[in-house]
Design a protein with these regions (language model features):
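Acidic, proline/glycine-rich low-complexity IDRs
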Residues: 1-32, 40-143
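Histidine-anchored nucleotide/phosphate-binding helix
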Residues: 37
Length: 143
């Protein structure tokens, strides 16, 4: 059976126009965003989230890669180190809350392989340790 993406990715980032309100998003801290899946519950699994403002295509590639791995039976939990996303480093999964539900945030280390809790972790990578509501600035557009 051919793998089929049967979940959605919801992405909010600076510069993105809201289809519903027609306003341009501008409220995230520089280097931060909120891209996350909806639909992993059909596999009895938490959804995934990324808050590092990579290009949308890269964020979707990573989120879909994780979703496809779940679809074929892999299970992930808080604290797991996951290989196969990047050739030169593992990513870490950390449980966070996103709009009232638990998700596994995919944490990418900086170019020196340092994670956010390392005091020398570079900007914007250290922002990945902030709660979802804390990557938002006052005065920005929010639905």
């Amino acid at each position: 059976m051919k793998p089929r993406i049967d979940w959605i990715i919801h992405g909010c980032a600076n510069g993105v126009v809201c289809e519903y309100f027609g306003e341009t998003e501008n409220g995230f801290l520089p280097g931060a965003c909120n891209f996350h899946t909806h639909g992993m519950e059909k596999y009895s699994h938490l959804d995934f989230q990324m808050t590092l403002a990579y290009p949308p295509q890269e964020l979707c590639r990573i989120l879909n890669t994780m979703g496809l791995r779940v679809q074929v039976g892999e299970r992930f939990k808080n604290g797991d180190m996951v290989s196969g996303i990047y050739e030169d480093c593992d990513v870490r999964l950390t449980e966070f809350e996103e709009t009232g539900r638990k998700v596994l945030r995919i944490i990418v280390p900086d170019k020196h392989n340092r994670f956010p809790e390392d005091s020398e972790c570079e900007t914007p990578y250290q922002l990945q340790s902030l709660a979802t509501e804390d990557i938002w600035q006052e005065g920005g557009f929010r639905q």
